[in-house]
């Protein structure tokens, strides 16, 4: 239907579903979900619990497409341990999903240059991305490699080398094909001055006060699935990656991950205000209202959830119905 002449039109806000994919202890690919990035069940006795198994990747992706997801993101959360080109099961998942899911598919994990330990052959990030695109991906999500690229960009005072994975992939496939996944965590400070002097963007965090009553924090980026901290903040990484050629930011928050208490609105606002490319809010969604909150209080263009959909606590349709009731443009 054509809108009335002079009526304001807005882009629909997107509801994205994420599927964190990894091998379980039996070697099968399963969809799992972390609690602050820990994907293993809590174990009362000494030792590790098993990997949470929330279903098969292709079956879940097909279900979410039928239920109205605007996009689906496959995140290969252990890909830093091996090369993507040797990960035939993950590529097969992507190929099968692309035959039944006719919405944009994003795949992340291992988008980097690497050398195969057995053959000694080196593969470039562009070649890795091309393999994912041939398997059916519409976008690739770059994580750790993007943080390293942002650090180099900052050190070089804004020099474009044309050698980063972001630049190489966006130059061939377009900026819309490159998503940056940022995994930050809060670092609380008593005063903003010291962190700001180090180049970090410090924000007021009254909604998430620190353990000692701190009301300021900055968001420190991590790599390797949250296992290693880097001396750079999320806002700086987002701005650098936009300059390098990224077309979208998938913004996570380790503190909020798996908590179901809502997105970190302070983080989402800080980053979405700092860049002009779309930002996808991620981590913390537990009910439909959380989507409406992040869309009305920040400038994000999309919001992502995983666990609440996997466990069928909330449906995609319930989220979109709530958004419609709040006059937030969405695809029904």
Name each model feature, range by range.
Residues 101-139, 188-191, 266-303:
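Catalytic cores of alpha/beta
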Residues 25-27, 258-260, 288-292, 311-314:
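Short active-site-adjacent structural elements
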Residues 71-72, 132, 140, 145, ...:
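Hydrophobic residues within beta-strands of alpha/beta enzymes
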Residues 21-23, 78-79, 111-113, 146-148, ...:
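Active-site-proximal loop/turn and secondary-structure-junction residues that shape catalytic pockets
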Residues 18-19, 75, 106-110, 143, ...:
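A cross-family glycoside hydrolase active-site/sugar-binding cleft signature
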Residues 86-171, 325-326:
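Glycine/small-residue-rich loop that forms an oxyanion/phosphate-binding "nest" at active or ligand-binding sites
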Residues 61, 94, 129, 166, ...:
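Generic hydrophobic/aromatic pocket-lining and core-packing "Φ" positions
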Residues 2-101, 157-161, 168, 172-180, ...:
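Conserved N-terminal beta1-alpha1 strand-loop-helix module at the mouth
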């Amino acid at each position: 239907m054509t809108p009335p002449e002079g009526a304001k039109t807005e882009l629909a806000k997107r509801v994205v579903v994420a599927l964190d994919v990894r091998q379980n202890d039996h070697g099968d690919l399963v969809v799992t979900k972390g609690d602050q990035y820990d994907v293993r069940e809590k174990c009362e006795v000494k030792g590790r619990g098993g990997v949470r198994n929330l279903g098969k990747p292709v079956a879940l992706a097909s279900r979410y497409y039928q239920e109205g997801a605007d996009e689906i993101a496959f995140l290969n959360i252990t890909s830093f341990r091996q090369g993507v080109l040797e990960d035939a099961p993950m590529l097969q998942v992507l190929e099968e999903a692309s035959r039944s899911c006719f919405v944009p598919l994003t795949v992340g994990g291992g988008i980097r240059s690497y050398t195969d330990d057995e053959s000694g052959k080196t593969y470039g990030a562009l070649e890795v991305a091309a393999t994912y695109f041939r398997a059916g991906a519409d976008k690739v999500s770059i994580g750790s490699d993007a943080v390293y690229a942002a650090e180099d960009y900052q050190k070089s005072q804004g020099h474009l080398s044309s050698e980063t994975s972001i630049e190489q992939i966006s130059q061939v496939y377009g900026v819309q094909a490159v998503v940056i996944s940022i995994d930050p965590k809060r670092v609380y400070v008593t005063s903003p001055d010291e962190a700001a002097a180090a180049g970090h963007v410090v924000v007021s965090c009254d909604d998430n006060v620190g353990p000692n009553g701190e009301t300021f924090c900055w968001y420190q980026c991590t790599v390797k699935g949250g296992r290693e901290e880097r001396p750079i903040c999320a806002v700086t990484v987002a701005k650098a990656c936009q300059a390098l050629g990224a077309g979208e930011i998938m913004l996570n928050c380790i503190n909020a991950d798996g908590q179901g208490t809502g997105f970190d609105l302070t983080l989402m606002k800080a980053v979405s205000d700092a860049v002009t490319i779309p930002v996808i809010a991620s981590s913390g969604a537990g009910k439909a209202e959380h989507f409406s909150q992040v869309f009305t209080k920040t400038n994000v263009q999309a919001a992502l959830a995983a666990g609440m959909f996997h466990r069928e606590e909330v449906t995609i349709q319930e989220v979109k119905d709530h958004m419609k009731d709040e006059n937030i443009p969405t695809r029904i």
